[in-house]
Amino acid sequence: MRPDGPRDPVAGPDSGPEPPYPVRLSGPVIKGFGRGSKELGIPTANIPAEGLAEYPDLQVGVYYGVVALDPAKFQYQEDQGEGSTSSTGGAGAGAGAAILPAVLSIGYNPFYKNKTKSIEIHIMPPLSSPSPTAEGAGEVKFHKLPDFYGTQLKLLILGYIRPEYDYVSLEALIEDIRVDCEVARKSLQRPAYACYIDGDEKECSDAVREQRRWLVNF
């Protein structure tokens, strides 16, 4: 069960990711258990878990990082009027992959007692957009994108947030995921992490630039 008490507002050192991070994972977006949107109202993009074989010491739990989707199949667009997003299939001429913040779980989800390990990624809105999961923001509506099954997704895991927990209720699970989103968002807003999303190429380290190139190269 989740321990009582307040959560830390950020995860990971302020100086930036430390080994083993960043962790690279990629694969086509596949159908998951079908619970994220239907039961929880939290859309997730699942990718095959086979890539975890390269990281045998990576523990189950909740993580944060950044993702990119193949722009040839999914073109990200931001609706400036509502602070929400939409997409259209197929990238326009010269369009590149957008790098977006993400929170994800790796494991078995004790609340649902899954038998197989999964990678479930919730893609969040850009850090420059209002947070739909901020406390006091009114009704919580998790960020939602149109379906993009089959689209190649690349993921850089930049840090670890917490272990997996079981919960006394569905509402308690949803609330902890809301907090996970806020912890991920605040963690990624720190300069040493934000550079993975939209850092000035001249200001980023060579290591960060190399990771960004991998992320958007489809």
From Swiss-Prot:
Residues of the signal sequence?
none
Sites binding Mg(2+) sit at: T44, N46
Note the InterPro entries from the entry.
Riboflavin_kinase, Riboflavin_kinase_bac/euk, Riboflavin_kinase_dom_sf
Give the span(s) annotated as Disordered: 1-27
Pfam families, A to Z: Flavokinase
What would be one Gene Ontology cellular-component term for the protein? mitochondrion
Query: Any idea which GO molecular function terms this record carries?
Result: ATP binding; metal ion binding; riboflavin kinase activity
Q: Where is the active site?
A: E120 (nucleophile)
Q: Which GO terms describe its biological process?
A: FMN biosynthetic process; riboflavin biosynthetic process
**This chain belongs to which protein, by name?**
Riboflavin kinase
Print the keywords alphabetically.
ATP-binding, Flavoprotein, FMN, Kinase, Magnesium, Metal-binding, Nucleotide-binding, Transferase, Zinc
Q: Does the keyword Transmembrane apply?
A: no
Reaction catalysed? riboflavin + ATP = FMN + ADP + H(+)
Requisite cofactors: Zn(2+); Mg(2+)
Q: In which pathway does it act?
A: Cofactor biosynthesis; FMN biosynthesis; FMN from riboflavin (ATP route): step 1/1
